[in-house]
């Protein structure tokens, strides 16, 4: 049963000296797994949301602005992605979007936090919409980095739906040169990878470093953005491949591909939106052009807060 609470807030740091307060209207589940603290709650302004280690990871208001932006550009740019690997994405919405594609025959989802996945199955049905029950899904509980380093399968697309690289957190190892080399080793010829890449406005250097690190491994690297109110502004992604280039798709081509290959009605992504996402604002382009650093296991990148 949902629990009604007196006055309470989620206080989320967005940058040094700046935070967002959201009133907690109702808590559905809260506690800690082996890997992270969690809360599934109704929050003022954004509705039902998943909060991990004090940061809003996803909300019912605009989760589709994130998940559709993460998944569809590289899958539509690929000729026909049959096998897809998802690292992270514990709430199931990324797999939900992958399974919309008629080409997809098999999805492997690797998440380290089994407790959180079970909580998502129970409390976040609006997100996964039954995706965990699909015959096409293989759910692997384990370390995403270890999985790709020991990968015996080849995938057409790899989607990295990760938490931010925080100092002391497990995800920083999933944004390094060594990790991206291992990811490339899991791709079939003509394959592509996409990663969430933090905020180009709140952590612009981190966004640029992630782009630069992927550029050390792949010949085609395309940074792009979406707007996610729950994340307090623009949110960044980077697609990478040696052959697949989503930025070359026109609005007309995207709309035709959606009609031909995607089941059901999308709520955020279409051809016009696709073109907008790859047209980065001038300040973001400036940071990308000025930043030379890249991340390694020895020198990882971290979000400021």
Swiss-Prot record:
Which reaction equation describes what this protein catalyses? S-adenosyl 3-(methylsulfanyl)propylamine + propane-1,3-diamine = norspermidine + S-methyl-5'-thioadenosine + H(+)
Q: Which residues form the active site?
A: 161 (proton acceptor)
Q: Where does S-methyl-5'-thioadenosine bind?
A: 36, 111, 143-144, 170
Q: What class of enzyme is it?
A: transferase
Pfam hit, one: Spermine_synth
InterPro entries referenced in this protein's UniProt entry, alphabetically: PABS (IPR030374), PABS_CS (IPR030373), SAM-dependent_MTases_sf (IPR029063), Spermi_synthase (IPR001045), Spermidine_synt_N_sf (IPR037163)
Protein name in UniProt: Polyamine aminopropyltransferase 2
Q: Which organism is it from?
A: Hyperthermus butylicus (strain DSM 5456 / JCM 9403 / PLM1-5)
